[in-house]
C-alpha cells in the first residue's frame, strides 16, 4: 500500500496516510525522548528494533484474541495499521512499584503489586500527563463508560498474555502503557508496545533493560533493547 503525506509526527514515530482512508503507515524513527519531549537523542537502529519488537508483540496479542491495529509489516521500520479514532488516554498496568507510582506513594522500588494496579493518564505533555479517574473521563467526554470498561479489560488481558512471556525469558514486566482507539465502533489496541513504553528488568540482577536506561543516564540503551528482543524471540534483521 502506497505511503502518502505525513499526518502526524510524534516523539518517536511518524504517521502517514495511504490511498485507503482506513489505513495508515507507522514509521519508527531513531529518536528517543524524555522529560515530556524536552530531551531528544537519536540511537542507531532503534527504529528498526522497536518496529520489529512491536510487530512481534502485537502478533502475540492477536493470537490471544486481543484486537490490535496491526495489519502487516511493510519494511524494517514501517508498519501498516488500521486508522483508529484514538482516546486521549494512556492505560497503565503496574506489576511492580516503579516510576511515578513509586515516587507518589513513597514505595520501595520493585515492590510486588498483587493484584496489579491499573492507572489512567491524560495524554497532555503541557500538563505532564496527569493521572485521572474514570469519572474524569466520563465528565470531560474523553471516553464513555462502556469504552473505559473495555480498555481496562483488555489491559489486564494484555498483562495475562505478556507477563508469562517475559517471565519465561527470565525477565520481569514491571509495568507498561497502552493506548486504545475505535475502529468501526470497536475498541482496539493502538500505538505500540516496545521497551520505550514499558519497564523490563532482568529477573536475577534486576538490571533495567528499557527506556529508563535513557531517562536515568545508565547507558547501553540499544544493547538492552536488543537483549530483551533476543530473549523473548523477536526476529531482528
Curated annotation (Swiss-Prot):
GO CC field: cytosol
GO MF term list: ATP binding; phosphoribosylaminoimidazolesuccinocarboxamide synthase activity
Keywords from the UniProt entry: ATP-binding, Ligase, Nucleotide-binding, Purine biosynthesis
Catalysed transformations (reactions): 5-amino-1-(5-phospho-D-ribosyl)imidazole-4-carboxylate + L-aspartate + ATP = (2S)-2-[5-amino-1-(5-phospho-beta-D-ribosyl)imidazole-4-carboxamido]succinate + ADP + phosphate + 2 H(+)
Pathway the protein contributes to: Purine metabolism; IMP biosynthesis via de novo pathway; 5-amino-1-(5-phospho-D-ribosyl)imidazole-4-carboxamide from 5-amino-1-(5-phospho-D-ribosyl)imidazole-4-carboxylate: step 1/2
Matches recorded under HAMAP family: SAICAR_synth
NCBIfam families: purC
Top-tier EC class: ligase
Family, per entry: Belongs to the SAICAR synthetase family.
Keyword Lipid metabolism included in the entry's annotation: no
UniProt xrefs under SUPFAM superfamilies: SAICAR synthase-like
EC number: 6.3.2.6
Any one biological process term the GO annotation gives: 'de novo' IMP biosynthetic process
Organism lineage: Bacteria, Pseudomonadati, Pseudomonadota, Gammaproteobacteria, Enterobacterales
InterPro entries: SAICAR_synt/ADE2_N, SAICAR_synt_PurC, SAICAR_synth, SAICAR_synthetase, SAICAR_synthetase_CS
Name of the featured protein: Phosphoribosylaminoimidazole-succinocarboxamide synthase
